[in-house]
Amino acid sequence: MLDKIDRKLLALLQQDCTLSLQALAEAVNLTTTPCWKRLKRLEDDGILIGKVALLDPEKIGLGLTAFVLIKTQHHSSEWYCRFVTVVTEMPEVLGFWRMAGEYDYLMRVQVADMKRYDEFYKRLVNSVPGLSDVTSSFAMEQIKYTTSLPIE
């Protein structure tokens, strides 16, 4: 279970994972050794799963965000494994979920423009048989985006 200090460390790291061990320890009123041990435990427990740099998609030429809803008539484990393999190998897919409700799957896709989206779409539908409905919506404006989880 996470205690108050663990939660504070996680909140700090979500805001800036480049903080030094010394800065983190001071922020939670610990010395560096117990702070390091907590961080190590959080990693070992799979709570801290990576440290990354976040990029601005528009500034690197990937300004089109698409949300793709998919329906399928196929639900066998073989088909599912093939579908998951194909989708997880597509670098344009930033998020991929199996859903409850009207649609079976949801993808978040990031590409340069509509031409690149069309290429992605064709690759997707030609790689996986049995997609009965592929509906795409395109983001006009990003109002909020965060990778920080609400830690309380």
UniProtKB/Swiss-Prot annotation:
Domain HTH asnC-type: 2-63
A single GO BP: positive regulation of DNA-templated transcription initiation
Molecular-function annotations in GO: sequence-specific DNA binding
A GO-annotated cellular component: cytosol
A Pfam family recorded for this sequence: AsnC_trans_reg
Phenotypic consequence of gene deletion: Slightly increased sensitivity to excess L-cysteine, the effect is more pronounced in M9 minimal medium. Loss of expression of dlsT(yhaO)-yhaM operon. Cells no longer produce hydrogen sulfide in the presence of excess cysteine.
Gene3D superfamilies: 3.30.70.920, Winged helix-like DNA-binding domain superfamily/Winged helix DNA-binding domain (1.10.10.10)
Keywords for the protein's UniProt record, in alphabetical order: Activator, DNA-binding, Transcription, Transcription regulation
Residue ranges for the DNA-binding region feature of this UniProt entry: 21-40
Transcription listed as a keyword: yes
Coiled-coil features, chain-numbered ranges: none
Domain of life: Bacteria
Role according to the record: Plays a role in L-cysteine detoxification. Binds to the dlsT(yhaO)-yhaM operon promoter in the presence but not absence of L-cysteine; activates transcription from the dlsT(yhaO)-yhaM operon. No other DNA target was identified in strain K12 / BW25113. Thiosulfate does not activate its transcription function. Overexpression doubles hydrogen sulfide production in the presence of cysteine.
Entry protein name: DNA-binding transcriptional activator DecR
Species of origin: Escherichia coli (strain K12)
